[in-house]
Design a protein with these regions (language model features):
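Mature catalytic domains of secreted/periplasmic carbohydrate-active enzymes
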Residues: 19-441
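Positively charged n-region of N-terminal signal peptides that target proteins for export
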Residues: 1-4, 88
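Sec-dependent N-terminal signal peptides
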Residues: 4-13
């Protein structure tokens, strides 16, 4: 523990000496965000009408001008912000991050600083972000905004390797000064109008290359000035860039990867931070972020619970994505899954919310979280594993299952090896079991 504290202090000091030090509000907001542990990502936009996923413009090789005309057919008549928030809250999630503007460049709010490519010029016309912000405030759910740095619609955006594949007959200008002015105008609108907790960037990776095993940034986004602009408005910054963190970034993001594991292939060369919150994002409709009608593979509630727990055991939040359809409804399969996840949280939430990594475990079979120095939670995720031993400093005051409170047998040897054995009748319910152990010196 002391070693971890020394490392964290050293890193904080390094940030100060480098010329940047987060303000008190920023540090407190980071801590509050980390304590939430579970959020819901929402990818939604014009692509929902196509029902082919959020990258359909690029992967389907559509003409951008033809694609953008879907704006005139976007009328999600079933959209109900309060219903969305109810589903999220009942699932045990503490925050929502929604795509205010994805790579296709369409804005889900009536922005005044674009060329009219936004919700105000659809048949629907209603301010989606405004309604969602109001519903979140009513229910105590934090709202964050995903914002794409990459833009397949605007001609002043300096095209990277991916944007250059978009079919478009208009002439490119590649004027970053103009594009940055546009982005800052939109970001100011988002923060001043809706008061999000976080601006969550994506798309910087379009201008990055791996050279000799290291990431090389091939475009100067002037992100320090953008981050300062956001921080001046008391809003946190996250950037899903698959690269080492910058000092002004408040949250480290891992896309479809647990910190340090790189199973999804996006995190190669991305060291895990020691001094800032971490968030892993993943999908409930297994292979897409935006709604895709042909994708019938959805994660089970047990899958989601295991992902939440494994993330928390690595000091990370989990941001689980749901892609609403063109009518504005969450897929029924996702709603059913999240309802079951919520039941688990009602019983076991204390083992996730406000916890830190427990520091003991056995691969994916047993992981742990903790609160303070005296409470440890063991999560038995593999039904075949019912006994776990680890070194413990101190003595056990009590040990019991969170679900039902049944006592759990523990044996502590003279050399400090604690063995925890699940009751035979309580070894598997599909979601694993959580043992709460209270310890003392």
């Amino acid at each position: 523990m002391k070693k971890c504290m020394i490392i964290a202090v050293a890193l904080a000091a390094a940030a100060v000496f480098a010329g940047y030090a987060p303000e008190v509000w920023n540090i407190e907001a980071r801590k509050e965000f980390a304590s939430k542990r579970f959020g819901v990502f929402i990818h939604w936009g014009l692509y929902a009408n196509y029902a082919q996923g959020e990258w359909y413009l690029q992967r389907g090789q559509l003409d951008e001008e033809a694609y953008s005309r879907m704006m005139y057919g976007f009328c999600p008549s079933c959209f109900d912000a309060r219903e969305w928030v109810r589903i999220v809250k009942d699932a045990g999630a503490k925050y929502i991050t929604i795509t205010s503007r994805h790579h296709d460049g369409f804005s889900l709010w009536p922005t005044k600083v674009d060329d009219g490519y936004n919700i105000a010029n659809t048949p629907f016309k209603r301010d989606i972000l405004g309604e969602l912000a109001a519903a979140c405030r009513e229910e105590g759910i934090q709202l964050n905004f995903y914002y794409s740095l990459m833009d397949w619609h605007r001609m002043d955006y300096p095209a990277g390797f991916l944007t250059k594949t978009i079919l478009n007959s208009r002439e490119r200008k590649d004027d970053y000064a103009s594009y940055k002015k546009f982005m800052l105008g939109q970001i100011a609108e988002l923060i001043d109008s809706y008061r999000p907790g976080i601006i969550w960037f994506d798309g910087e990776w379009e201008h990055a290359r791996e050279i000799d095993g290291k990431f090389t940034r091939t475009h100067d986004w002037q992100l320090d000035s953008i981050y300062d602009f956001i921080h001046e408005r008391r809003t946190l910054v996250a950037n899903n860039n698959h690269q080492p963190m910058r000092e002004r970034e408040d949250i480290q993001l891992f896309e479809r990867d647990l910190p340090g594991e790189n199973e999804g292939g996006f995190s190669k060369g991305q060291p895990v931070t020691l001094d800032r919150p971490i968030e892993q994002c993943d999908v409930i409709q297994k292979n897409v972020w935006g709604y895709k009608i042909a994708e019938k593979s959805f994660r089970s509630a047990a899958d989601v619970v295991a992902m939440v727990v494994r993330a928390a055991a690595k000091d990370s939040n989990l941001l689980m994505n749901i892609g609403p359809d063109g009518s504005g409804q969450f897929p029924a399969e996702a709603v059913a899954t999240m309802a079951e996840v919520g039941k688990w949280f009602k019983v076991n939430g204390e083992s996730v919310y406000g916890t830190r990594a427990g520091g003991v475990g056995k691969g994916k079979s047993v992981v742990s979280t903790r609160k303070g120095a005296d409470i440890l939670y063991l999560h038995f995720l593999d039904p075949a594993v019912n006994v776990f031993s680890f070194k413990l400093e101190g003595k056990v005051v009590s040990s019991a299952l969170l679900d039902g409170g049944k006592p759990v047998d523990t044996v502590l040897t003279a050399d400090g090896l604690l063995t925890v054995s699940l009751p035979k009748t309580e070894r598997s319910n599909g979601f694993g079991r959580v043992v709460k152990i209270r310890v003392a010196d």
